[in-house]
Amino acid sequence: MINYPESLANRIIKGSTLDKDEANELLLLEGTDANALFLAASRVRDHFLGTGVDLCSIINAKSGRCPENCAFCAQSAHHATNAPVYPLVDEEQITACAREAAGAGSHCFGIVTSGSAISRGEELDRICRALRRIRRETAIEPSCSLGVIDYETALALREAGAVTYHHNLETARSFFPNVCTTHDYEEDVETVRVAKRAGLKVCCGGIFGLGETPEQRVEMALTLRELDVDSIPLNFLNPIEGTPLAGADRITPLECLKTIAVYRLILPDRKIAVCGGRERNLRDLQSWMFFAGASGTMIGNYLTTTGRPPEQDWQMLADLGLTVRQCNG
């Protein structure tokens, strides 16, 4: 079995694709076979993307009171949490955070707002003004994560300077009703398609540890491949008190790493960033995410939880002998 991941990597490098049954089998590997999987994923990443690492950062630009009932989310109005609640911040604060992110080495800066969708009018106008300033004043690539959007909104964001639109599927279609019942999975899929039609790159992934099966993790990866997304953020549940998943069992570091590796083999030439929950779930194996095929990570704080200082991530990358891709505007 130890040669099996290597043979799959060779096949993928030659242009073949990983199918569902192969992916499910890989998630069952243990011991030295799992190490062989990580090595295969790392080889595939190096072949298609090189060894440079992409860093990204976000601002929680509008927080709390979300009408959706996503079971993992601290910002849902359906859950009693201590998440901060505030309206959309001003363009100066957004731009200042973008400058700070660029100074910390981030390649991409995401403007994230709570809620089902951003409102047309002043909210959208303010975000567009901030996007224009970010493009003028920094070399960082701006991204937006504003919920469900229509084509006109997507076009306005792109024309203002947004490079990427972020919108997660969160989990597999077959498991989604266990996570959220206030909107349909197809709305999220259509948002991805709308952003692509408007000429935006799409960053789309999900969160693991919600109670989904390994097979459902593969299911989401295959959906992302079908949607032809450009980059995939992989998050791991950090349970928040007051949410329905506050007492959820954590997945093991090795489960996290195998998931990262299988996503790399399913999506060989796409950017894969490990984001929220990495500190809690990977623990002492955080640096292994790159050995398992990740090509990037989020630095700084997350939406409602604290990340570690960027200097620690820079030191981790230096210790691994990895370089950070530079912003080029």
Swiss-Prot record:
**Which SMART domains does UniProt cross-reference here?**
BATS, Elp3
Query: Which GO BP terms sit in this record?
Result: biotin biosynthetic process
Describe the location of the Radical SAM core domain by residue ranges: 48-278
Q: What is its EC number?
A: 2.8.1.6
Question: Any signal peptide, and if so, which residues?
Answer: none
**Domain of life the protein comes from:** Bacteria
InterPro entries per UniProt: Aldolase_TIM (IPR013785), BATS_dom (IPR010722), Biotin_synth/BioAB (IPR002684), Biotin_synthase (IPR024177), Elp3/MiaA/NifB-like_rSAM (IPR006638), rSAM (IPR007197)
**What molecular function terms (GO) are annotated for this protein?**
2 iron, 2 sulfur cluster binding; 4 iron, 4 sulfur cluster binding; biotin synthase activity; iron ion binding
Q: Which family does it belong to?
A: Belongs to the radical SAM superfamily. Biotin synthase family.
Indicate the quaternary assembly: Homodimer.
Protein role: Catalyzes the conversion of dethiobiotin (DTB) to biotin by the insertion of a sulfur atom into dethiobiotin via a radical-based mechanism.
Q: What is this protein called?
A: Biotin synthase
Q: Which gene encodes it?
A: bioB
